[in-house]
């Protein structure tokens, strides 16, 4: 049954992801947001090997051991009567394409930047993916309570490298040991950091009338006034329309570890981030206000609960409403199913739900029939597009210590590849199994999970592959010639799509120049 308050439920939802480079403070920010949302009483920022304390969003065994976030966690909490759907992506240096794909399921991104380091490699790559969809970006420059680079220098770097126009919303008052707080340019309030006075903020009057010297000292007061005058003349004012188009990014400063500035971020997400947006299908645009249910699978996680050896499919709801016991069409396999046991998430914990709306992420039990990119509807035969696979960057040949377990190995690799942990390739000339990943740590994850979840001991050999490109060719004669001339470089992925595995960029360039009517693609639509 369709609720009459559907529009109201849409307006109450924000679905966003947090992305960053390793050690920028993303996990701490996630924990503090859950704290503000009253999901946890004390942020669990301490985590490490043998400590027994781990971040709420880190629930896989290898994550707890290493103190990093490998999988994408989905968390739901309420802040000021707004339902926040937070998709927490891995922040460590080596993550999987699952990290990239998660950005297709959100309506906004929060980018976290270390004030001492500025923009780093993984942030650049994630931003490239976010910009494919012109996703609105809010930026938080973290760790101002430590030695930092000049804020204007960081903003210049953001504008140059990320191609975003910066709009400072808050501005830091000094940094490191002298960090005093931030000035909120639009609220016209100075928020004090760990103030020794009985005040947490100062109004604009205090800022103007000279009494600020009492709190900051004469020299710092003069400096911050001059700096603010400069940035308010140089940078444009916030324009929500340009933000929603992915042209500008509002900038906030703070210290996640010091629990300073996180409430400003949450307030901005409520105020500026879009409520659930439309999605493009292969036939038409699907709007969240529509009565009929639609949703797509953007992630599959195997064995979240080792006791049950289950597989969970993560679905982003696009339109309509989920109600317990409803009948849906699994479009790819043309099968109707009854969904009576969907649930929401808090890291490793599941909460059974009776109802969910566009923007929400729900979990479905998967017995091997659901794949990434699958669409579920109430009968309409559509497929959501823009949920790609990304070409891996690192490759390994995997083989068994016990050759008799080849069947179990293939089963385990199929499941791990379907959830986006790694990609599996079968060369057309032999029976080897080649794995491809975005980051090197994913290979460790595969070995660990094969051992724990499938009782398989496997090892790797290096393989002479540096690039992979999917083949797209409508000319059968050209495709035949490619297979005949370059068969030793060709393989099939898990969906039987042909892919070229190049030993060098020079090799790939030569093959591409000799086969101009064949497309060599770095992404493949699911």
From Swiss-Prot:
GO cellular component assignments: cytosol
Subcellular location: Cytoplasm
Span of domain tr-type G: 11-277
Amino-acid positions noted as binding GTP in the UniProt annotation, renumbered to this chain: 20-27, 88-92, 142-145
GO biological process terms, semicolon-separated: regulation of translational termination
Keywords assigned by UniProt, alphabetized: Cytoplasm, GTP-binding, Nucleotide-binding, Protein biosynthesis
Single GO term (MF): translation release factor activity, codon specific
Name of this protein: Peptide chain release factor 3
The keyword Protein biosynthesis is assigned to this record: yes
UniProt KW Cytoplasm keyword: yes
Primary localisation category: cytoplasm
Family statement: Belongs to the TRAFAC class translation factor GTPase superfamily. Classic translation factor GTPase family. PrfC subfamily.
Annotated PROSITE patterns: G_TR_1, G_TR_2
UniProt function note: Increases the formation of ribosomal termination complexes and stimulates activities of RF-1 and RF-2. It binds guanine nucleotides and has strong preference for UGA stop codons. It may interact directly with the ribosome. The stimulation of RF-1 and RF-2 is significantly reduced by GTP and GDP, but not by GMP.
């Amino acid at each position: 049954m369709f609720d009459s308050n559907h529009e109201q439920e849409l307006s109450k939802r924000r679905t966003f992801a947090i992305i960053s480079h390793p050690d920028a403070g993303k996990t701490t920010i996630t924990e503090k947001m859950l704290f503000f949302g009253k999901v946890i009483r004390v942020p669990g920022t301490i985590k490490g090997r043998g400590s027994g304390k781990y971040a709420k969003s880190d629930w896989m065994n290898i994550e707890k051991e290493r103190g990093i976030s490998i999988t994408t966690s989905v968390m739901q909490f309420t802040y000021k009567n707004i339902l926040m759907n937070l998709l927490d992506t891995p922040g460590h240096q080596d993550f999987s394409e699952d990290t990239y794909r998660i950005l297709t399921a959100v309506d906004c991104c929060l980018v976290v930047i270390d004030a001492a380091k500025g923009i780093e490699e993984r942030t650049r790559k994630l931003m490239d993916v976010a910009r494919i969809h012109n996703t609105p970006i809010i930026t938080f420059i973290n760790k101002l309570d430590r030695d930092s680079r000049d804020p204007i220098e960081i903003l210049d770097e953001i504008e140059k490298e990320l191609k975003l126009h910066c709009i400072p919303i808050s501005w830091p008052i000094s940094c490191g040991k002298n960090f005093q707080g931030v000035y909120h340019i639009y609220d016209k309030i100075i928020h004090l950091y760990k103030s020794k006075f009985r005040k947490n903020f100062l109004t604009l009057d205090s800022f103007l009338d000279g009494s600020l010297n009492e709190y900051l000292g004469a020299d710092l007061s003069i400096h911050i006034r001059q700096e603010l005058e400069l940035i308010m003349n140089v940078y444009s004012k916030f324009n929500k329309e340009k933000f929603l188009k992915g042209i500008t990014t509002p900038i906030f400063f703070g210290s996640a570890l010091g629990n300073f500035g996180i409430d400003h971020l949450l307030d901005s997400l409520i105020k500026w981030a879009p409520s659930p947006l439309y999605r493009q299908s292969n036939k038409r645009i699907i709007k969240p206000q529509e009565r009929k249910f639609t949703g797509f699978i953007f992630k599959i996680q195997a064995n979240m609960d080792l006791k049950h050896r289950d597989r969970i499919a993560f679905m982003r709801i696009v339109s309509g409403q989920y109600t317990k016991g409803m009948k849906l069409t699994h479009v790819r396999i043309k099968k109707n199913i009854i969904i009576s046991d969907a649930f929401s998430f808090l890291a490793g914990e599941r909460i059974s739900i009776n109802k969910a709306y566009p923007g929400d992420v729900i979990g479905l039990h998967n017995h091997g029939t659901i794949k990434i990119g699958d669409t579920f509807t109430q009968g309409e035969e559509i497929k959501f597009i823009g949920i790609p696979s990304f070409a891996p960057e690192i490759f390994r040949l995997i083989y068994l210590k016990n050759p008799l377990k080849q069947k179990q190995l293939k089963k385990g690799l199929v499941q791990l590849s379907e959830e986006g942990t790694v990609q599996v390739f079968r060369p057309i000339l032999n029976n080897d199994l080649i794995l491809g990943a975005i980051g090197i740590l994913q290979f460790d994850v595969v070995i660990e999970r094969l051992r724990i979840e499938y009782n398989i001991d496997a090892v790797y050999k290096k393989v002479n592959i540096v690039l992979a490109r999917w083949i797209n060719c409508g000319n059968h004669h050209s495709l035949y010639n490619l297979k005949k001339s370059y068969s030793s470089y060709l393989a099939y992925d898990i969906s039987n799509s042909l892919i070229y595995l190049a030993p060098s960029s020079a090799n790939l360039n030569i093959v591409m120049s000799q086969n101009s009517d064949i497309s060599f693609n770095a992404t493949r639509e699911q």
